[in-house]
Swiss-Prot record:
Region (Precorrin-2 dehydrogenase /sirohydrochlorin ferrochelatase) residue spans: 367-507
Protein name: Probable multifunctional siroheme biosynthesis protein HemA
Lyase is among the record's keywords: yes
Other information: During catalysis, the active site Cys acts as a nucleophile attacking the alpha-carbonyl group of tRNA-bound glutamate with the formation of a thioester intermediate between enzyme and glutamate, and the concomitant release of tRNA(Glu). The thioester intermediate is finally reduced by direct hydride transfer from NADPH, to form the product GSA.
InterPro entries: 4pyrrol_synth_GluRdtase, 4pyrrol_synth_GluRdtase_N, GluRdtase_CS, GluRdtase_N_sf, NAD(P)-bd_dom_sf, Shikm_DH/Glu-tRNA_Rdtase, Sirohaem_synthase_N
UniProt region (Glutamyl-tRNA reductase), positions on chain: 26-174
Summary of the function given for this chain in its UniProt record: Multifunctional enzyme that catalyzes the NADPH-dependent reduction of glutamyl-tRNA(Glu) to glutamate 1-semialdehyde (GSA), the NAD-dependent ring dehydrogenation of precorrin-2 to sirohydrochlorin and finally, the ferrochelation of sirohydrochlorin to yield siroheme.
Signal sequence region: none
Pathway named in the protein's UniProt entry: Cofactor biosynthesis; adenosylcobalamin biosynthesis; sirohydrochlorin from precorrin-2: step 1/1; Porphyrin-containing compound metabolism; siroheme biosynthesis; siroheme from sirohydrochlorin: step 1/1; Porphyrin-containing compound metabolism; siroheme biosynthesis; sirohydrochlorin from precorrin-2: step 1/1; Porphyrin-containing compound metabolism; protoporphyrin-IX biosynthesis; 5-aminolevulinate from L-glutamyl-tRNA(Glu): step 1/2
Amino acid sequence: MQLGRHNSGSIKKRLEMYILSIISASLDYKSAAIDIRERFSYTSTRIREILRRIKAADGVSGAVLLCTCNRTELYISGDNIENMNPALLLCQLSGEEDHKSLMTLFSIRHDSEAIFHLMEVACGLQSMVLFEDRVITQVKNAAAISREEKTIDSTLETLFRLCITAAKKAKTEIKVKAVPTSAAERAITELSKKYCFTDKRILVIGNGEIGRLCCKKLIELGAEITITLRKYKHGEIIIPVGCNTIPYDEREEVLPLSDVVISATTSPHFTITYDMIEKLERKPEIFVDLALPRDIESSISNFTGVELYNLDRFYTDYSVLNQKEVSKIREIINHFILQFEKWKDYREEAAFTKIPDLHNDTLYGRFPLFIDLSGKKVLVVGGGEIATRRVKTLLRFGADIYLVAPHLTSELQEMLNCKLINYREGYYESQDIQNMFLVIAATNDRETNHKVYLDAKEKGIQMSIADCREECSFYFPAIFEFDGIVGGLVSQNGDNHSLVKSVAEQIRKIGQATD
């Protein structure tokens, strides 16, 4: 792209703002053992501190730090950052003095390589558990923290949004073979090949997501589970069905009664120490540490008859079983990389225009198009509160509603009594979608909603899927009207429903005030 023909220093300045480089540093289970990885494992508070420090560096426009039990990855965008070493930054900010040896464990990627790698990470292709579910949430949370700290710029915001969308599309459309969906499931699956857990007494330390998943899997295998609970100041305590509970502080009392101990907390300190085990006459046979930083002091493996497992001992390469699926996921990745390149091209071209409105670097994903629904057949699958709200809105636009659900809310029943809607009692079947103009899936069952999506996609029917915005061909709007004006509100990505609802309410109040 040549600048000379434009004779504008301001355009060059705008281009410097818009065309930013991306650089990343990655440390994961492939390059570093767990004792190294835990040195670069950070609390949420520490992540925020690191992001603020990096954002303040010269040339840095944005920074996102992804930190999981199996990887630490730093993504930086900015101008003239090609010579920046993000691995060195992490070493310095982590207080590590042995920079030279540690930096060799990091993979440094620039621009297209960094973009492709992040896409693969989000889709689970780089995970220790291939195609794992949790990584999507972890990538999403990393971007959210950067957003809260104001360290994410539009380049990384767009990249992470597209990565998350690609990952959810891959998860929805590609079915894989015999792959555990989490570290917890993988650990229990691998251990059950060597040990029989039936009637074994198992202590699970940590009532987070991983701990609860372990409990669920072990109960299926016939184990007797005791799980620890902390005294939380906020939030609901979820106790897995079939588990006994004890306070976290009483875990030592249960150790001599346990055959197996599994620990999966976010504690910065050991939950099980050498001293705790040394004084026991009867020691648990198996210890499983699913935390990073590690929960269980590694020296307990020195005791006779004690086996200690950590995350690195559960790696299994499932990619051989799923080569076709991996290829399909990479096709999805390439599609979203093209979307990102399209967005970058838009920014570059917008920098040359004199029209101020085009200097906005947001490329909207959906166009808000109002269509005539008068007499058009619309299928609504579901009979709950969400379906009720959808039907009430659609009726105001003259749609011919066909409803399929095993049960109806009282409001929907009243609409049926008044012959405002057509109704078939029962569960959704593919034939229900025949000759429909639009389809709304609003059940509380993911499998049903996904089936509606697949059927609608096959027949080329526009669909709104209440529990999965990635499966929506259109987002169902919040409607407002006053003084002859009818409008619909959605967020750019189809999420943030509470904000959309709040804004719509404010607009309605303004309309009422002007009446």
